[in-house]
Amino acid sequence: MAAAATQGGRSGGLGGNSGAGGGSNCGTGSGRSGLLDKWKIDDKPVKIDKWDGSAVKNSLDDSAKKVLLEKYKYVENFGLIDGRLTICTISCFFAIVALIWDYMHPFPESKPVLALCVISYFVMMGILTIYTSYKEKSIFLVAHRKDPTGMDPDDIWQLSSSLKRFDDKYTLKLTFISGRTKQQREAEFTKSIAKFFDHSGTLVMDAYEPEISRLHDSLAVERKIK
């Protein structure tokens, strides 16, 4: 009984010391990890096949997008995506009309309508190619920063990226467009994907997030100076 009491007292003392140490660690670590905890992707590590270039690029793009939207609280604008969806919807409309018309009026009676729909479909595909090449480019995020006073138009932030096939160099570009002056500034980095993924293919946000924040902060500082 006495030995058990003594052992319990020691355990209690150790628990108290551990609690004090935990409080100290919390005080020093919360400043660094507090922001990261807010925008983990689904609170799970992002793990991909390192040899799948598309998966690598998509995971890096999604994580960069997550930082701007959740850390900096910007509002995503879906205008670019809506434009592409509109073009695709019109293209599908022509295809459906051709299908229904051919069913109701079998060939060759449906020939003029089929020809018109086929030509229209390929014209829309050409428009889509031009749209993605010159309008969308490689942009995967357009986000707005609301003016706190509500007096000036929104500032616009754009993220675009590239990763060539069979290459390990990933380029991320951040573009800032001032809502008030319409001036545009850019910052980018090119890094090996090996810097952001461990040996198992898990994205290391502690290595990736600072690179994105540096890009953002460099443009944000210029904005404040001007």
Swiss-Prot record:
Stretches with biased composition (Gly residues): 9-26
Keyword Zinc-finger belongs to the record: no
Keyword terms, alphabetized: Acetylation, Endoplasmic reticulum, Membrane, Transmembrane, Transmembrane helix
Residues found modified as N6-acetyllysine: K169, K191
Lumenal topological domain residue ranges: 108-111
Membrane topology classification: Multi-pass membrane protein
InterPro entries in UniProt: Spc2/SPCS2
Domain of life: Eukaryota
GO biological process, one term: protein targeting to ER
TM spans (from-to): 87-107, 112-132
N-acetylalanine PTM sites in chain numbering: A2
GO cellular component, as recorded: signal peptidase complex
Region (Disordered): 1-26
A Pfam family the protein falls into: SPC25
Subcellular location: Endoplasmic reticulum membrane
Cytoplasmic-facing ranges: 2-86, 133-226
Function field: Component of the signal peptidase complex (SPC) which catalyzes the cleavage of N-terminal signal sequences from nascent proteins as they are translocated into the lumen of the endoplasmic reticulum. Enhances the enzymatic activity of SPC and facilitates the interactions between different components of the translocation site.
Family: Belongs to the SPCS2 family.
Subunit structure: Component of the signal peptidase complex paralog A (SPC-A) composed of a catalytic subunit SEC11A and three accessory subunits SPCS1, SPCS2 and SPCS3. Component of the signal peptidase complex paralog C (SPC-C) composed of a catalytic subunit SEC11C and three accessory subunits SPCS1, SPCS2 and SPCS3. Within the complex, interacts with SEC11A or SEC11C and SPCS1. The complex induces a local thinning of the ER membrane which is used to measure the length of the signal peptide (SP) h-region of protein substrates.
Protein name stated in the entry: Signal peptidase complex subunit 2
Species annotation: Macaca fascicularis (Crab-eating macaque)
